[in-house]
C-alpha cells in the first residue's frame, strides 16, 4: 500500500466538474429568458404573423377581421338553407 492517501477522482475529476459547471453556465446564459423570444405556444417564425407590434407581418384591422368572419358565417348559413330548400324541391 502507498503511504499517501489520494482523494477519489483526484484533481482530474475536479477539473471536469469545474469545466462542466462553466459549460452549463454558458449554455444557460445563451437561452432566451422570455416566452416571447422562445415563441409562446409555438414557433415564432410562423408563416402569417397577425397584428403584433414587433412583427413585420400582415397588420389587419379588427374591423376587417369581424367583417370577414361575419361574411364567412353568413355564407355557411346560406349554403345550409340552400341545401335544405333544394332537397325539398327536388326530392
Curated annotation (Swiss-Prot):
It is a single-pass membrane protein. It is found in: Endoplasmic reticulum membrane. Residues 30-45 have a biased composition (Polar residues). The gene is SBH1. Necessary for protein translocation in the endoplasmic reticulum. InterPro entries: Sec61-beta/Sbh, SecG/Sec61-beta/Sbh. The lineage of its organism: Eukaryota, Fungi, Dikarya, Ascomycota, Saccharomycotina. It holds the Pfam family Sec61_beta. It comes from the Eukaryota. PANTHER family: SEC61 SUBUNIT BETA (PTHR13509). One of its GO terms (cellular component) is membrane. Keywords: Endoplasmic reticulum, Membrane, Protein transport, Translocation, Transmembrane, Transmembrane helix, Transport. The chain crosses the membrane at residues 63-83. Residues 1-62 are cytoplasmic. Heterotrimeric complex composed of SEC61, SEB1 and SSS1. GO terms for biological process: post-translational protein targeting to membrane, translocation; SRP-dependent cotranslational protein targeting to membrane, translocation. This is Protein transport protein Sec61 subunit beta. Residues 1-45 are annotated as: Disordered. Belongs to the SEC61-beta family. One of its GO terms (molecular function) is guanyl-nucleotide exchange factor activity.
